[in-house]
Amino acid sequence: MSNIVWHQHSVDQADRAKLKGQNPVLLWFTGLSGAGKSTLAGALERALFDAGFHTYLLDGDNVRHGLCKDLGFSVADRDENLRRVGEVAKLMVDAGLVVLSAFISPTREERDSIRARFPEGQFIEVHVSTPLSICEQRDPKGLYVKARRGEISNFTGISSPYEAPLSAELTIDTSKGDLASQVRALIDYLTAIEVINPSRLTASA
């Protein structure tokens, strides 16, 4: 029998959420490289932050500077990268935050594994469904060019598959419409499921 037990603190998630005036959730942005995940998540965070909500954005590149700096890009390492991010996100949600996470996360199994760690309604999958052709045209980091040349192996969308969500809570193609309207759609959804109070958004406008 393990000697490691969970210590229940006197302040819980509900207490922290009440203090912050919001219902904590994890918004998981998934899609191809260049789909616009980080841009969309960043714009949503800015809108929420400016309205006084407590947020944090976990970005695929940023976590590899510290939390996951010891990991490469093998299948095993990518799985471990997402496992760690999922655990950190869970702690942040427990702290009462609205957490935004922008990762390719190419397999349904990976995403479903993270979803399973959260109570019903706290994991919101946002499929950034921008087509491969558009992502490849954008290619902000030059990664698609390298992948086509064979310089990058197991590159999602080129030499490694991306499994689109079957039942994402939201689907947004960033090649259609403008960023402001896409953020508005996200905010409308969060308002509808009572994650945020719309009156605070009105007051900050």
Swiss-Prot record:
ATP binds at residues 31-38. GO terms for biological process: hydrogen sulfide biosynthetic process; sulfate assimilation. Catalyzes the synthesis of activated sulfate. It comes from Shewanella sp. (strain MR-7). The active site is at 105 (phosphoserine intermediate). It is an enzyme of class 2 (transferase). Pathway: Sulfur metabolism; hydrogen sulfide biosynthesis; sulfite from sulfate: step 2/3. Belongs to the APS kinase family. Gene3D superfamilies: P-loop containing nucleotide triphosphate hydrolases. CDD domains: APSK (cd02027). Its EC number is 2.7.1.25. Pfam families: APS_kinase (PF01583). The gene is cysC. This is Adenylyl-sulfate kinase. NCBIfam families: apsK, PRK03846.1. It catalyses: adenosine 5'-phosphosulfate + ATP = 3'-phosphoadenylyl sulfate + ADP + H(+). The keyword Thylakoid does not apply. Keywords: ATP-binding, Kinase, Nucleotide-binding, Phosphoprotein, Transferase. InterPro entries: APS_kinase, P-loop_NTPase. It comes from the Bacteria. One of its GO terms (molecular function) is adenylylsulfate kinase activity.
